[in-house]
Amino acid sequence: MELLPHEKQVVEYEKAIAEFKEKNKKNSLLSSSEIQKLEKRLDKLKEKIYSDLTPWERVQICRHPSRPRTVNYIEGMCEEFVELCGDRTFRDDPAVVGGFVKIQGQRFVLIGQEKGCDTASRLHRNFGMLCPEGFRKALRLGKLAEKFGLPVVFLVDTPGAYPGLTAEERGQGWAIAKNLFELSRLATPVIIVVIGEGCSGGALGMAVGDSVAMLEHSYYSVISPEGCASILWKDPKKNSEAASMLKMHGENLKQFGIIDTVIKEPIGGAHHDPALVYSNVREFIIQEWLRLKDLAIEELLEKRYEKFRSIGLYETTSESGPEA
């Protein structure tokens, strides 16, 4: 597993404890109580490190190569999966994976952005950057869910929509705008979970729904820290400062009313205990479906409309205090 800078001390401590345990099998160097003390110290070290992460360190956790992706969530929390492909206009976009799933016996249409896990799959998936046909594919599956009366789950994980010339020629901006319009009035419950990066229009084009959640170390922002740093300061070394200023993590966005729920991750991030994360996300999806399923469609759409209309309130600070 690739190590992040803040993880090195923890891993060294874990290796030392493992070595002591191995040597103890031959010679009793430490008693079991002494090893337990070392393990308690390790737990305290983890708590100290991971409770004081900077926003930029959390972005690094979010981008960890071993972080679970959409295909992992499908495998880890769904009993069944029937994949559907294509946008019925141009081609299939591998950056979007979707189809019929069953979660705890309930059928959903699940649609997720997929980055890939190695060089070959990342190239195939275009690093999770959707083309217009990806947004059309997502909308097609959403409309199919509406037709059959099934709730929709979106899993968001993208560095942004693909900015290439071919995507622009095929109407990238229009495809995103069309999704915003159509998803805002999709007549079925829509649940969104940001499982990794949620960057710019690439994320927003699949994130209009009735309940929006984020994993603890995921981020959701108008731009990446690198993009912000390059525009504001023309200096890529300002990534950390940009990450702090953007207020891109769950606790900030919940306060702003942009998301509804922050889903806890294991200490160190989702890649340290994927099974626990699958369980937490599954529990959230079922809980929200139970809350939304009995609402009349008119009420559901009205609440969704009001939810997104209320986004955009802000506060400025002057010498005399906060101003609305």
Swiss-Prot record:
Pathway: Lipid metabolism; malonyl-CoA biosynthesis; malonyl-CoA from acetyl-CoA: step 1/1. The keyword Transport does not apply. It is found in: Cytoplasm. It comes from the Bacteria. Keywords: ATP-binding, Cytoplasm, Fatty acid biosynthesis, Fatty acid metabolism, Lipid biosynthesis, Lipid metabolism, Nucleotide-binding, Transferase. One of its GO terms (cellular component) is acetyl-CoA carboxylase complex. It catalyses: N(6)-carboxybiotinyl-L-lysyl-[protein] + acetyl-CoA = N(6)-biotinyl-L-lysyl-[protein] + malonyl-CoA. InterPro entries: Acetyl_CoA_COase_a_su, ClpP/crotonase-like_dom_sf, COA_CT_C. GO terms for biological process: fatty acid biosynthetic process; malonyl-CoA biosynthetic process. Pfam families: ACCA. Its main location: cytoplasm. One of its GO terms (molecular function) is acetyl-CoA carboxylase activity. Acetyl-CoA carboxylase is a heterohexamer composed of biotin carboxyl carrier protein (AccB), biotin carboxylase (AccC) and two subunits each of ACCase subunit alpha (AccA) and ACCase subunit beta (AccD). This is Acetyl-coenzyme A carboxylase carboxyl transferase subunit alpha. It comes from Chlamydia pneumoniae. The lineage of its organism: Bacteria, Pseudomonadati, Chlamydiota, Chlamydiia, Chlamydiales. The gene is accA.
